[in-house]
């Protein structure tokens, strides 16, 4: 039974063999990283490889749909009836707001009794559109297509965790970005070096950055999209590029602390609990010391 079905309609208990072989779980497609499924870490690399050449890098994106991973924010309906801004990427906003392209289950707006075709990949237009051959290179890349379907079936979520200081929110480091662009201009082309930062570096998962994957030969596990690609990950030149990509991403200013944002200007609304506790513990220690 699903969570929106009537309890009285539960089917009778079916008896089956007690000793079937337990099937091994198949890991999901895409890169491995700590935490839950992240749009920026799993889906954006697919878009960077197969989509942004038409939907982002041109002056006028095809179908007026930009799939660049440039950070942005947009207004959503909160809960309950509390409008707020969500931090995401241009690509996420474009896919989410194109009518009918993505079909998600929004809280308190689901159908009374959910059916398989109500939401997710089966109800969204995106998966059938890709299966029809819109992007042959993506359709040929089955792992990439499975990443898209997994994202749709996970209700098109953006962040991979509930941290207040997320990898997805990191920014470019000015000096690091300048050094990276200089390297790309010298090794590949000035045109590549001038592309938007988000088209070169994935701040959420730098190892999946287009600057790295496109520069690596296909037979070495890369995308082989640039002229004279690097032959392997072990050559000094590729290791230098990897270090430059890492340095082009600024670290988060703060780290979560005891489930709170720990930021100078609190955004979680709960830092006062920890701060009050620390204040009174210090006060009690002072009083205890004075009583001796």
Where do the language-model regions lie?
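Aromatic- and Gly/Pro-enriched helix-to-coil junctions and flexible linker segments
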Residues: 1-292
